[in-house]
Amino acid sequence: MQRYRTLAGALGWGQMLISIMTHIPSNRSLIAVAGFCWIASTAPVASQDQLFLTLATGGVTGVYHPAGTAICRAVNKSRSEHGVRCAAEAGSGSVGSLKQLRDRDVDFAIVQADWQHHAYLGTSVFAEFGPMADLKVVAGLHTEMAAIVARADSGFMDLSDLKGQRINIGPAGSGSAATWGQLSQHLPWSEEDRAAITQEDLSGLGEALCSGEIDAYFVVIGHPAGVIEETQEVCPVQFIEIGAGISEKMVADAPYYRAAEIPSGTYGEHNAIETIGTRALLITVEQMPAHAVSTVLRSLLSDIERFRTVHPALTDLDGAQLVEAKTEAPLHLGAVQFYEDQGYLP
């Protein structure tokens, strides 16, 4: 979990000393060794205690990656003061990031609340792994909403018209693909009706839709979404609503979903688009030092004005919203301490 990356830590003092003595002529070895020992004895202690963190995000065309990059940028601005450094990694999405966190391949992750729920309880696609009981929440970010996008001339009116059509639901491991799996449980479709569904990433979706390679695509994302705006630059689009009937069933089945609306005008639409929504969360594991968690939160809040400009979905984010992350998984101790100090928790 703690990635200490110093030259001495990588090689070991003894190995470095042997390397020096091996590669320096013998008549200068004593001077070299003496000089090396002086450098080692006077090296700043802080350089040996740097904590390197990795943050799993998502595809570069969504909200998660720019948000994660901005969080790490905020942390790194003051790294000489708190001794923490951060790097954001692009990935396949929520499910993939949760598996990385479970395997300790990353230290933090930005994921959808629904898949954090399943990972914590060991249900759905995480059933084979069992509960991830050490999963902890750090902060709530923006609201993610599902969108089903089709060409304006498709003639589709509602979800029933998509039966048997070529729908891209996002790559395996993405929150979008997993959420489609939940939604499709409420659709009376046969295996044959689902046979044409594809799982490609977001890049090139606009071209694929407008050229007729696919008939529609499904994404769960913060809005306005770049992938949808890019599609509109290629051809006119329409949105297929997830009606109240299915929304109510999904909310009844799972508390992490809620009925939602993409506001009118977001994509030039005259009316709001009925859909479902869930929260994007910043998460970690219990073993992460409280100092690291509080440092990430303090850095984010201190740079919140810049953070809001990263994506329109983050425009209204503030400290009070960060703590609004109601899930089965509890807040990390470092987050609790930070929010209490800031007055966001009683």
Descriptions of predicted regions:
Residues 49-163, 171, 239:
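Short, glycine-/small- and polar/acidic-enriched structural segments
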Residues 32-40:
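Bacterial N-terminal signal peptides
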Residues 204, 210-211, 221-239, 291-346:
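An extracytoplasmic/periplasmic, membrane-proximal ligand-sensing/linker region
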Residues 3-7, 18-31:
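Bacterial N-terminal signal peptides that target proteins for export
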Residues 52-78, 144-211, 305, 325, ...:
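Bilobed "Venus flytrap"/periplasmic-binding protein-like clamshell domains
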Residues 113-115, 123-128, 154, 191-283, ...:
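Pocket-lining segment of extracytoplasmic ligand-binding domains
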Residues 38, 44-87, 133, 305-346:
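N-terminal hydrophobic or amphipathic helices and topogenic motifs
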Residues 165-182, 255-324:
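Ligand-binding clefts/hinges and TM-proximal coupling segments of bilobed small-molecule sensing domains
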